[in-house]
Amino acid sequence: MKQQKINVNSTPGFKVIKAWLASKKRKPFLFQQQTWEQVIAGNSGLVNAPTGYGKTYSVFLGSVINFINEYPKDFAAKKNNGLQLLWVTPLRALAKDIGRAMEEVITELGMQWRIGIRNGDTPISERQKQKTKMPEVLIITPESLHLLLAQKGYPDIFKQLKIIAVDEWHELLGSKRGVQVELAISRLVNLQKDSMVNSQWLMENNEKKKQQHINSAPQPINNSTIQPLNHFPSIWGISATIGNLDEARDVLLSSLNKEGIIIKASLDKKIEIASVIPDEIEKYPWAGHLGIKLAQKILPVIEHNKTTLIFINTRGMSEIWYQQLLTVSPELAGVLALHHGSIERELRTWVEEALHAGILKAVVCTSSLDLGVDFRPVETVVQVGSPKGVARFLQRAGRSGHQPDAVSKIYFLPTHSLELLEAAALKEAIAESFIESRQPLLLCFDVLMQYMCTLAISDGFYPDKIFKEIKSTFCFREILEEEWLQLLQFITAGGIALNQYDDFKKVEIIDGLYKITNRRIAMRHRMHIGTIVSDAMIKVKFLSSGFIGVIEEWFISRLNPGDVFTLAGRNLEFIMIKEMTVLVKKSNSKKSIVPSWMGGRLPLSANLGQMLRRKLNEASDNENFPEKEKELSALKPLFDLQKELSAVPKENELLIEHIETKDGFHLFVYPFEGRLVHEAMAALLAYRISKITPITFSFAMNDYGFELLSDQPIPVDDSNVYELFSEENLFADIQKAVNASEMARRKFRDIAVIGGLIFQGMPGEKVKQKHLQSSASLLFNVFAEYEPNNLLLRQAYNEVMYQQMDEVRLRNMLQRIQQSKIIITVPARLTPFCFPIKVDSMRENLTSEKLEDRVRRMQQQLDK
């Protein structure tokens, strides 16, 4: 379908907005003007522009211009216009900031529009107000949007809707929350189609009745139940740069079944990247200790900038960094804050407001401040440790200089010396715009099952109609009719395996309409709409006063009364657990346990891995060593030692090291493909070697390579190495190598929760984690035995293969290795490359203090 084009300059709305911008001594950017033209033409698409250049205004002001064009004479006076713009955002923290920016525009234009926010933090009273009188703009999370679809009479909410905007679409794409957005859009788009059909029917029916009653008194026609939408809502995504923008657009607009456009700003955001180089480069590096020792080096950065964000990859490490900065610089007390997802919401909100006000010098944070929050006082960002991907590093850099023409400044602080190689790789990747793609998810049956029940507790649904809608989404375009029928059977009768249990017969069929009428089932479902399944979180509270934050159940279960742990930057003594709340008191102890949260370790992205291999290619060149690159230059002593003992692999080479120590026989392999792929590869290689000779292994891995350790020589040599790394029989071998059924069992817990098979409990009375897992295991066993073709069971295995083990990337790696030269060396001792992997293998059995002592002794012996 050809895109309509309208000259926006001549419209009344544009003239009003242009005058408003001029009053602030600003002009619209070309990409904003292009977006406004497309918005007022009723087209859909994706906006891509650098951070700080007004992506939000590109779509929001398009909506305002639309409205002014519709009511040029009285746009300022018109009230209660119904929901015009639905703004979907992935983070609650973003909602307040976006709402503030929109309110400012509306107030200065003198319009009567109201900006509403709806998420888990919205008070019930505010939600009730919205129900009776919707604001013109509603900023909402995917979960809260599905809760709206769960209300009876929800079509009335959207009858005036003109635009659906999805902010930070690159963050939602490739996640189950993104699938939620796809499904919601399919419903909202089809509400309009329903309305058009109803309108046509109404017109034809009116005409018939006129003919029938032409010679008698006219009869009133009751059309109160038919309230047609006035338009076709256009859909706009707002996205940072990713490697597959075209696909991102197609996924978002799939339900429209018409071509969309990409509006890409031709603006280059200036980014300054500087590495914090240690005074002394360790030739035997190891992860996790160096960063803290470099804390002193970022004090001048904090001092010379208005506000600095210090990004740490895990919540546990952010607690350590906060304490360390206060130790090395006590004068930061009062102007240094901590922000992560487990700190109580009120404290997080205070930190965000203080950032806006510019009263903080620095904030130690995690990904909780990753996304587009506009903190203008932030002048500099420090990234501690590997960001694991190019896009994430760019995103974090963009938190500084968050306005047009400002420079984004970011410092890379390594947690071990080899990470300086990543700094060099990141610089080159950004210079070449070599940014990761976000792969969309397919056939998420757990999300679909939840969505079907959501529709069933509102007005119900007719299967044939909803099936067509669902097939219009990108995620479910390949769904088969037999799969759809299996889902319908499951929600109405419990499927084949569970048809004896009434708890799984949630949906009734009333004259062909699928509907949930049981109030208890409906209430439980509403409470657990969403796809974010985390380990059970328990609130932490002072014995005498307020809440501090939340901690994971598994961590608290290991503590004894009197143990001291750190949360929200405070040392706390554990007293007891009472009514699912951890009671604590302040502790003056200098020693404490720092919580670690599950899932804290992200894998290295394929793009960054590729760039690392390219940088190694440069480092391996003795004649043309890149002395001008200060990161590689600083690492030269390490590379020289690696070459002396073993080799530095080129881009088209794979290095394997055989090393014998008192611990046994080690095999180290360096694909530079990230922890998850290495974990799968280690298991696969071990399985294939065990078919050659009976042998047992222990594994260790990091983002650069992996280790197999055995008590006997490991039979890998030039005669069999290519065969061992073959992609032949990969699927079958990996299933046997990793105990796929046990991994699928663990995945199934989350799938069962999202799909509504397991109830997580009432607020404040959450079901314990071990009980959830045992319930999920029981269901898994039942399906495996009595319903092996169950869709949720199949999904669990698919998620293990294609997400957890990244089978596609593993296969690509094996194909690359087949084209590479494999270098096998036999170093006399541990090398700089294998040392961090060796240290990682010792972590599980040693405390951090004992580990540091052991590593120091090993380094001294190796340096002799």
Indicate where each model-derived feature is located.
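Extended, highly charged accessory segments
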Residues: 467-470, 474-537, 551-552, 595-596, ...
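Helicase motor core with emphasis on the C-terminal RecA-like subdomain
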Residues: 2-10, 15-19, 27-34, 40-53, ...
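Cationic, low-complexity basic patches in intrinsically disordered or flexible, solvent-exposed regions
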Residues: 201-202, 211-213, 220, 228
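Short, well-ordered loop/turn sites that connect or cap secondary structure elements
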Residues: 532-534, 559, 566
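Short beta-strand-centered aromatic/proline hotspots
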Residues: 570-577
